[in-house]
């Protein structure tokens, strides 16, 4: 389990290259070719650092990607039907379309499933038979797999959710998952090299039972307060709540767009100290602008300079920036069809806030903290903790 910034891909690549050096046959699978190639690329770097080269095949996806060009021992195979004949040992990377084929049954020593929190249980069952050992890589506290339709029982869970389901606390209609993998079941990477301790503290206590901490270098990060010019942002690092009351907004708030623009203008050009200790002025590229709804994303894109990094949480998983500005955009009581459960979803809040290396700013209607039901109270508890951090 790799929480944000803990180096899950880095660690997995070192495990894989060690197994390859021991003569094991390895499969790497995920939902997308991009995820598979990303892990393979890190494996190539790890192999080169140890004086070896990555050997094997990458099946499907783009044949001219830099991955194949930078790893001479890695061959590209376009068609899944040709893969088994082309594989002569080492590593093989592909999606479920490859590993679910009958000719791969029992052929590998280990199968690594990356981003396992977004791989469906059905797909995992279909591909797992190709290997004698299965290793899941991911974090069940980040974005869940997209689901269409209704699925009975546990069929709608991802393979990681299924593996980490708390059977004692779960109800038939409400599954509960271990926020941290039990020590007798797997490995938890507990040190982030991304977040300043004041950002990490909220993420750790709210999502990971207090088990996540920052590397000591992360404490160097700070954004200098400009003398006499500070109005909205009064902290050099951490989480800042910027309240904006508005009425009748469901998926878009012009009031919040205006506030986000003011915050961005105030931060632009301020002196930012990195975790390496170097100092430079903040630029547009140093800020992520996140909103739950596409309507608010479009409104922010229209207001911000061209080239601004604007999107929903889904777009930015795996990315980072010195500053993250989250606009929740819904007025009190106006939560739309998805409701408050979508706006304040724990996993989405986790991903949004943990993109920030130094400073996270939450722009929202403060009256959201008025709950009307027990279920809403659980969500509001997280919101209140976020606002008071």
Model-based region annotation:
Residues 19-26, 48:
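Post-Walker A helix-loop "phosphate-sensing" segment adjacent to the P-loop in P-loop NTPases
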Residues 11, 15:
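Hydrophobic positions on the alpha1 helix immediately C-terminal to the Walker A/P-loop
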Residues 35-69, 299, 303-305:
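Conserved helix-turn-beta segment of the N-terminal RecA-like "Helicase ATP-binding" lobe
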Residues 1-3, 29:
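Residues at the beta-strand->loop junction immediately N-terminal to the Walker
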Residues 21-23, 31-37, 42, 97-113, ...:
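Conserved helicase motor core of SF1/SF2 NTP-dependent helicases
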Residues 7:
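Conserved glycine(s) of the Walker
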Residues 52-98:
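Inter-Walker segment of RecA-like/P-loop motor cores
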């Amino acid at each position: 389990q790799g929480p944000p910034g803990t180096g899950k891909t880095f660690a997995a690549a070192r495990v894989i290259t060690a197994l390859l050096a021991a003569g094991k046959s390895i499969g790497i699978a995920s939902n997308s070719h991009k995820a598979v190639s990303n892990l393979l690329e890190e494996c190539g770097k790890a192999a080169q650092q140890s004086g070896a080269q990555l050997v094997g095949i990458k099946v499907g996806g783009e044949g001219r990607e830099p991955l194949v060009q930078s790893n001479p021992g890695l061959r590209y195979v376009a068609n899944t039907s040709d893969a088994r004949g082309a594989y002569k040992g080492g590593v093989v990377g592909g999606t479920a379309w490859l590993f679910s084929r009958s000719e791969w049954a029992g052929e590998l020593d280990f199968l690594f499933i990356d981003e396992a929190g977004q791989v469906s249980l059905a797909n995992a069952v279909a591909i797992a038979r190709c290997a004698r050992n299965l290793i899941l890589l991911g974090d069940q506290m980040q974005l869940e797999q997209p689901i269409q339709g209704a699925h009975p029982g546990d069929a709608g869970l991802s393979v990681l959710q299924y593996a980490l389901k708390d059977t004692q606390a779960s109800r038939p209609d409400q599954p509960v998952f271990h926020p941290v993998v039990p020590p007798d079941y797997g490995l938890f990477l507990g040190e982030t090299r991304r977040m300043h301790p004041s950002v990490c503290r909220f993420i750790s206590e709210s999502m990971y039972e207090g088990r996540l901490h920052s590397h000591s270098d992360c404490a160097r990060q700070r954004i200098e307060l400009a003398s006499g010019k500070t109005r909205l942002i009064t902290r050099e690092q951490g989480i800042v709540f910027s309240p904006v009351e508005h009425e009748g907004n469901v998926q878009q708030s012009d009031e919040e767009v205006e506030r986000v623009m003011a915050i961005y203008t105030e931060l632009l050009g301020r002196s930012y100290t990195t975790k390496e200790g170097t100092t430079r002025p903040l630029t547009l590229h140093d800020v992520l602008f996140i909103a739950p709804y596409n309507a608010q994303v479009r409104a922010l894109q229209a207001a911000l300079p061209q080239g601004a990094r604007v999107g929903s949480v889904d777009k930015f998983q795996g990315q980072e920036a010195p500053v993250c500005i989250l606009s929740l955009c819904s007025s009190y009581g106006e939560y739309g069809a998805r409701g408050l459960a979508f706006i304040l979803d724990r996993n989405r809040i986790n991903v949004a806030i943990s993109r920030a290396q130094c400073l996270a700013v939450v722009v929202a209607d403060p009256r959201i903290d008025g709950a009307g039901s027990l279920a809403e109270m659980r969500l509001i508890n997280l919101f209140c903790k976020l606002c008071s951090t």
